[in-house]
Regions:
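Conserved nucleotide-sugar donor-interacting segment of glycosyltransferase catalytic cores
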Residues: 1
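Donor nucleotide-sugar binding/catalytic pocket of nucleotide-sugar-dependent glycosyltransferases
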Residues: 5-59
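Conserved catalytic-core segment of nucleotide-activated headgroup transferases in glycan assembly
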Residues: 12-13, 21, 46-140
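Acidic donor-binding loop of glycosyltransferase active sites
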Residues: 24, 139-156, 164
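Glycine-rich, N-terminal phosphate-binding loop of Rossmann-like dinucleotide-binding domains
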Residues: 30, 77, 148
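Short glycine-rich, flexible loops that bind phosphorylated cofactors or substrates
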Residues: 35, 82, 152-153
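Donor-sugar nucleotide-binding helix/loop cap in glycosyltransferases
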Residues: 161
């Protein structure tokens, strides 16, 4: 199995290197990520860091104090993306049962929930599907959670939550 992974990894690296030449410009989010690109022209890759729209993702001046009778947890993302599906299932199946207090509620907010995500809905778990203003969801939450066990890169959802 290790041999197959090595062969496939090498094939993918060659493919990515060839594809690099088909584009006039290249961007990446960090200098460290750029160092991982095995191409002779990697120093020409433009670094464009992730960020959030501060006009939209800003703390509310009118947020009510936390309600001790109901604690609101939030996880956001495209709910058809495999790492988000995995995180949602992990939250509901592994973490929520550990929270013995019945006043803890979880909102899974995000577009296109797969059947596995929709099936997680319960009295304590709300699956929203698409929401018009995700910033409102962040403001309503007491705590944002992002138990991502798969995927790579800087998650904008974490930046959005920190800004809200």
């Amino acid at each position: 199995m290790r041999w197959i992974m090595m062969v496939e990894g090498n094939r993918l690296a060659r493919y990515e290197s060839r594809m690099f030449d088909y584009f006039d410009a290249h961007t990446i989010i960090s200098k460290n990520d750029r160092l991982l690109i095995p191409h002779r022209d990697r120093d020409g890759i433009h670094i464009v860091p992730n960020g959030v729209e501060l006009e939209q993702f800003t703390p509310s001046d009118t947020k009510a104090p936390p309600n001790p009778s109901k604690r609101a947890l939030l996880f956001t993302g495209n709910m058809s993306y495999a790492p988000n599906v995995d995180a949602a299932q992990f939250l509901v199946e592994e973490i929520m049962p550990l929270l013995q207090t019945p006043n803890v509620h979880l909102t899974l907010a995000g577009a296109q929930p797969k059947a596995q995500v929709s099936a997680l809905a319960s009295e304590r778990v709300h699956v929203t599907g698409w929401v018009d203003d995700i910033a409102d969801e962040y403001r309503k939450a007491d705590l944002f959670v992002a138990p991502l066990r798969m995927g790579t890169g800087l998650q904008n959802k974490v930046l959005e939550a920190m800004s809200s």
